[in-house]
Design a protein with these regions (language model features):
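Juxtamembrane membrane-water interface segments of multi-pass membrane proteins
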Residues: 11-15, 77-97, 220-241, 262-271, ...
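Early transmembrane hairpin module of multi-pass membrane proteins
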Residues: 54, 60-61, 68, 111-118, ...
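Hydrophobic, lipid-facing residues on alpha-helical transmembrane segments of integral membrane proteins
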Residues: 104, 108, 247-254, 441, ...
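Functional transmembrane alpha-helices
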Residues: 66, 188-193, 197-227, 260, ...
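Polytopic transmembrane helical bundles with strong interfacial aromatic enrichment
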Residues: 2-372, 598-603, 607, 614, ...
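Juxtamembrane non-transmembrane "cap" segments at the membrane-aqueous interface
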Residues: 342-350, 567-591
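Secretory/periplasmic and organellar redox-cofactor proteins
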Residues: 476-488, 596-599, 642-660
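Aromatic-anchored segments of alpha-helical transmembrane domains
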Residues: 111, 180-188, 255, 413-421, ...
Length: 664
């Protein structure tokens, strides 16, 4: 008779052996990525500036490898293994955190050197000439890519320094989010950010790069640090979580890669241009990686789940890592190769917005001229689907969930889609008045519906509880975010109010809006800011979910009324201004049906002044209903207390009378 037993932790020799085997593999992968990028560029680069081209390519490969290793190590430390009950990282997670620090150092230096190479490449000058002159600092202010590399270098430096001191789960998760954000500045200012359809190209590329960072970095971290944890439950947990992450990443990479190639490359150029051949090579590598991912799930992860052995995982991942780094090399060469037709200049509207605007924004066009926003449209759909799955899980176990909350959440998601993907989203970058309408929808309407949906409460009820001895999961991570000092600070009434109303004045009256108008990534940040700040403001006011700060209903009402004059004054200022905000950008578009820029701005001011009325009505109704229900619950509680304990005040009074009667 056999007895199942818990697998024993790997011995130090076994762990060292695994690490010693993986590190040379990583070195070979890095070298292969560099050689691949250089070799492919030798087929496509011209005769001038080869040192700059190759230098920038090599430093870009090193920066990307440093970034994915940083992200992957932090992913492993924060989410693949459980911390101690005190919140301090376990040994394997701590080792991953320290490795992230060193990887971020590589990322920092490679990004910093890329600033110089990028400037030299942009003006076709030797690197030495750029360093010896005052061009180095002058070009940073004039060129987008050097600025992006400098921002990336700064983020990498912060992550490298902070990772040396962090020991808790909270700080590790924060550094993971920061590192992931640090991978974005460079790609949003590259090929995908210019020319026709650059909005679709940029949005899909952001998804693509995040997925690459999580998949490649996560796999390397799992191999290097997984054995430091144990071959028992912790390793199984890490392998299972990474397997699920890898599957999602592969789907995202495939979908976003197809979209990016589709907007950049006609099918006829797929096999007849250098850019097309590089795309084909990258697609082939992605298919191979998908095959290895499938084998990992079927053999490697399954073997760990069944018996705790990681041999199959290591063998498959070894080849997978090599292919991954080869793909990074192809991607680096692709980023340095102009797509076909890059010399063709589209009209001013398509050049600035990525698409054309066919006539004035009539009501019919606003409702029918859709252009799906890959980021916010996908986000809204994902939020709606996850919410409905949570409701279905509750109903499957017999728990009720109010229909009104579901309707509110779906209306919030629909508002996001309409604001970013309908004709409103299409015309918003080209007209100030339409932009203000989307601004109001994202900051004052969608958040109202979302906070009334109570998604956090739904998630806490639907997600499994880790238990006393179980590893923290999504439910515990969500609770940590809600209870974090950052959430408590942001939901302070004064802070929330200042963020909500102050953002209007800072963005439009400081010159930031003028600077941001011709940058697609800036529009993405504005939309995200509007939505997030609106949610932060309305959450403690009418939110169903428990906020870090529970305010009395009178204080909530005060927050709402305190914001009204600031919104009204903002709209009045816009309507009375004679200076046109973003005048040069809007004039450059040359829209024949939008010549009256001042009138359009005044219309936008009127929208800002009046648009708060409908959300205000919804907020006041919701707040008064919640107030009445809270009073009703309190009255019922007092009644139950009286029924169970008796009317203590009346009994005390009667006892006093009896006592007086006896004395007399």
């Amino acid at each position: 008779m056999s007895v199942d037993s818990e697998p024993k932790p790997a011995s130090p020799d076994a762990r060292a052996g695994t690490t010693a085997g993986v590190l040379p593999l990583i070195f070979i992968g890095v070298l292969l990525a560099i050689l691949t990028a250089v070799a492919l560029l030798s087929l496509t680069a011209g005769d001038t500036g080869l040192v700059n081209v190759y230098g920038l390519t090599v430093t870009r490969v090193l920066a990307e490898i440093g970034s994915v290793l940083t992200v992957g190590s932090l992913l492993f430390a924060a989410f693949m293994v459980a911390p101690k009950k005190s919140g301090v990282l376990e040994v394997g997670a701590y080792a991953a955190l320290r490795t992230a620090s060193w990887a971020a150092v590589l990322w920092f230096f490679a990004a910093l050197v890329s600033v110089v190479f990028n400037e030299a490449d942009a003006i076709n000058k030797p690197v030495g000439e750029v360093l010896r002159s005052d061009l180095l600092f002058t070009l940073i202010g004039e060129l987008e890519q050097p600025k992006a590399w400098l921002v990336t270098a700064f983020i990498a430096l912060v992550v490298a320094a902070a990772s040396r001191f962090a020991v808790s789960w909270g700080w590790t998760a924060t550094l993971f989010a920061l590192a992931l954000f640090g991978t974005l500045p460079v790609p949003v200012t590259g090929h995908s950010s210019a020319g026709g359809q650059h909005d679709l190209a940029t949005n899909s590329l952001l998804f693509h790069l995040v997925a690459v960072s999580l998949w490649v970095g996560g796999l390397v971290a799992l191999l290097v640090f997984g054995r430091r944890v144990t071959t028992g439950p912790e390793l199984r947990l890490a392998a299972t979580r990474f397997s699920a992450t890898a599957l999602v990443c592969w789907i995202v990479m495939a979908a976003s890669g197809v979209i990016n190639a589709w907007v950049r490359l006609p099918v006829s150029d797929l096999f007849t241009t250098s850019y097309g051949l590089l795309v084909v090579a990258k697609i082939a590598a992605l298919v191979v990686l998908g095959g290895f991912g499938y084998l990992q799930r079927k053999k490697g992860v399954q073997a760990i789940t069944d018996g705790g052995t990681s041999g199959a995982l290591v063998r498959l991942a070894a080849v997978e890592i090599v292919v991954m780094f080869l793909t990074i090399g192809i991607a680096a060469a692709l980023s340095r190769t102009p797509p076909p037709g890059v010399g063709e200049v589209p009209d001013a509207v398509a050049l600035q917005l990525g698409y054309t605007l066919d006539g004035a924004p009539t009501l019919l066009r606003l409702l029918t001229a859709w252009r799906f926003d890959i980021i916010f449209g996908t986000l809204a759909i994902a939020l709606a689907v996850l919410y409905l799955l949570g409701v279905r899980r509750l109903k499957a176990r017999g728990d009720a969930w109010p229909v009104g909350r579901t309707i509110a959440w779906l209306l919030g998601c629909l508002t996001i889609v309409i604001a970013t993907s309908s004709g409103f989203g299409r015309y918003a970058p080209g007209m100030f008045s339409i932009h203000m309408e989307t601004h109001m929808m994202l900051s004052m309407l969608a958040p109202v519906f979302l906070v009334l949906g109570g998604a956090v409460t739904l998630a806490l009820r639907a997600l499994p509880v880790a238990g006393k001895d179980g590893p923290p999961g999504p439910r515990e991570w969500l609770l940590a975010i809600v209870r974090s000092p950052v959430s408590r600070f942001l939901t302070h009434p004064v802070v929330a109010l200042v963020l909500f109303v102050g953002s209007f004045y800072v963005l439009y009256f400081s010159g930031l809006f003028d600077v941001a108008l011709d940058k697609h990534w800036a529009h993405l940040l504005m939309n995200a800011h509007f939505l997030l700040v609106g949610y932060i403001f309305y959450w403690p006011v009418i939110g169903i979910d428990p906020a870090p700060r529970r305010l009395p209903h009178l204080a909530r009402l005060g927050m709402v009324f305190a914001s009204l004059p600031f919104h009204a004054f903002f709209g009045v200022i816009l309507m009375s201004m004679t200076t046109i905000i973003g005048e040069r950008f809007y004039q450059g578009l040359g829209l024949s049906w939008a010549n009256d820029l001042l009138g359009d701005q005044q219309l936008g001011g009127g929208i800002a002044w009046a648009a708060g009325e409908l959300p205000l009505v919804i907020v006041l109704i919701a707040l008064l209903i919640q107030w009445a229900r809270a009073d009703e619950r309190e009255a019922k509680r007092q009644d139950r207390k009286a029924d169970t304990e008796g009317d203590t005040e009346r009994e005390a009074y009667n006892a006093m009378l009896r006592d007086l009667s006896e004395r007399s």
